Amino acid sequence: MIEIKNLTKVYKLNKKQMKESKTKSNRKVAVDHLSLNAHKGEIYGLLGPNGAGKTTTLRCIATIIKPTEGEVKVAGHDVVTEAEQVRKSIGFLTSDIKLDPQFTPDYMFEFFGRLHGVSKEVLKERKEQLFEYFGIKDFAHKQIKELSTGMKQKAA
């Protein structure tokens, strides 16, 4: 379950950003007191025009950025005080994927597994499971720059 209570995210603007935004305020409210409960099995879509705060909301849920105010919980874990637990429960994938074009999906999986202290045995077993599940085996050793957008999303 995802619980959001009065989520607010305010960005501070520098002078250049204020000029570009044609504003005298040094604050930009990206999300303003959003509340939402998403229960297990439910599917939600965040709809709105550019600048409405959709991506900012998702980044707060995924612990990529911290809320200015409010509370966000994922599976009962607070995104600020229990970020590690939250990240074990969810993933976040944007349409703008930033992967090193020289890497392969196989290399990335090994690299991040080792980075998080996963043993070789567990890493091998988990990689086999996930590559099979997501259909990555056929392109596991191709460089990211050779992959289609869909393949990149699977690798990410």
Predicted regions and their residues:
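Conserved ABC transporter NBD signature motif
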Residues: 70-81, 85-86, 90
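Conserved ABC ATPase signature
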Residues: 143-150
